[in-house]
Swiss-Prot record:
Residues 129-152 have a biased composition (Low complexity). GO terms for biological process: regulation of transcription by RNA polymerase II. The lineage of its organism: Eukaryota, Amoebozoa, Evosea, Eumycetozoa, Dictyostelia. This is Homeobox protein 8. The keyword Cell cycle does not apply. GO terms for cellular component: nucleus. It comes from Dictyostelium discoideum (Social amoeba).
Amino acid sequence: MENNNNKQNVKNRNNLKIKFKEDFCNDSTEVEQQPPSNLSSPTSYIQGNKLYFNFYDNISNNVSNNYSYNCNNKNNNNNNNKNDNGNYYFFNSENILKNNLQQNETKNSCHHLNQSYNKIEFQNNYQSDYQSDNQSDCQSDNQSDNQSDNQSEIQNNKDGNESVVPPKVKKTRSRKTKEHKDQLENLFNSNPFPDAIEKEIIAYQFDMSVEQIVTWFKHKRENLKKAQHLEYKQNSTKKFTKTTKELYVYFENYPFPQEERVEYFAKSYHTSNEKILNWFSKKRYSLRKTHSFIYDKGCGLYKYENSNFNFCSHFPEKKFDINFINN
């Protein structure tokens, strides 16, 4: 009985295979000669009107198979078009799962490697930047220290040795010929105190600068003063500031001097009568607020008197030598 049952099962299975083959081949159209390259390795595929039976063997062994169909048209290269009559390809699901797992593992490993590489590169860049910053800071600190050391050394050298100070640059001296010197001597004898316009004219004539002319006249006056050669006329105001005691005494008694007295003072001070008169007028102007000038009928001269002090009683009139004026 068991043998009969086994035979019957084998017969039914063969009939099922043949029936499926006939139905499938009748409905199929022209197919490609080789499976497409973008699919994984199929366990079975259709070529022409032939069906390889490893597909049925897998069915008989109750292995879960994943199959898909791809409708291809000769005028269309799209493998996912469902409206086209086409070829049926069968794949093993275990292989697909393995391939997917392997691809996922490789993707994860690549992603992990990329992350680790980026992390290492970031660390290296950070370290290099940090080192470069430290080096630049160290260099700047060293430069500042060197500059401070150099400045301290220079200061010490200046304190310890005065020869470090650079010497002063001497001015270029004017080379004057003998003719120029003789002409300058003649100008000095005529006027030892030339004004600004005369100095410019002299400088233009002798092809010299105004400063050189000023220094030459100044040195000439100093040399004559040291040698006590005072033939030239000195400045009268300087001499008045030194010896004006006699003028003050006469002014206290007679603020308006007579002509004889003016000539006497001009000859004694080696100046002109006009400068003596100017001195008296300025002195009267300076005392205009504190003193009053009155006319003395007995003397016939103007005098000034103060409310607190009477100069006429304390300073008698000084007698002047008329012969000195005539001489």
